[in-house]
Swiss-Prot record:
The lineage of its organism: Bacteria, Bacillati, Bacillota, Clostridia, Eubacteriales. Keywords: Ribonucleoprotein, Ribosomal protein, RNA-binding, rRNA-binding, tRNA-binding. Binds 23S rRNA and is also seen to make contacts with the A and possibly P site tRNAs. This is Large ribosomal subunit protein uL16. GO terms for biological process: translation. GO terms for cellular component: cytosolic large ribosomal subunit.
């Protein structure tokens, strides 16, 4: 699972989802990408599930880049606990994804293989996604 090795503060405020992605919104490494169309918190387990889905489909071919990292802790208080008595314990780590953020990049495979692998990964994520090609940086919407 993706988690930070060290953090300065164990508990943080909840991350904001306002606005659009102003960095990480272009394909930089691979030939194909998966771009978020909605804001969301994506957990380390969801990122791992998408990574496994892509790797299973492309098998030994291609190189995958994961361009998001879950660096924000989400805390949860136990069930049936009264208000107060401090902040809850960290439950899991999330990556803040804003619209336009390219989350995964893939190269070394054909367009058909990349499109299907990204479609499978999009089903594992809680956001609507778009498949991108480096040449056009446009794409089509994939419901998830």
């Amino acid at each position: 699972m993706l988690t930070p090795k060290r953090v300065k503060h164990r508990k943080q405020h909840r991350p904001s989802l306002a606005g659009k992605a102003n960095k990480g919104n272009t394909i930089t490494y691979g030939d194909y990408g998966l771009q978020a169309l909605e804001p969301a918190w994506i957990t380390n387990r969801q990122i791992e599930a998408a990574r496994i889905a892509i790797n299973r489909y492309v098998k030994r071919g291609g190189k995958l880049w994961i361009k998001i990292f879950p660096d924000r802790p989400l805390t949860v208080k136990p069930a049936e606990t009264r208000m107060g008595k401090g902040k809850g314990s960290p439950e899991h780590w999330v990556a803040v994804v804003k619209p336009g953020r390219v989350m995964f990049e893939l190269s070394g495979v054909s367009e058909e293989v990349a499109r299907e692998a990204m479609r499978l990964a999009a089903h594992k994520l809680p956001v609507k996604c778009k498949f991108l090609k480096r040449e056009e940086m446009g794409g089509e919407v994939s419901e998830s």
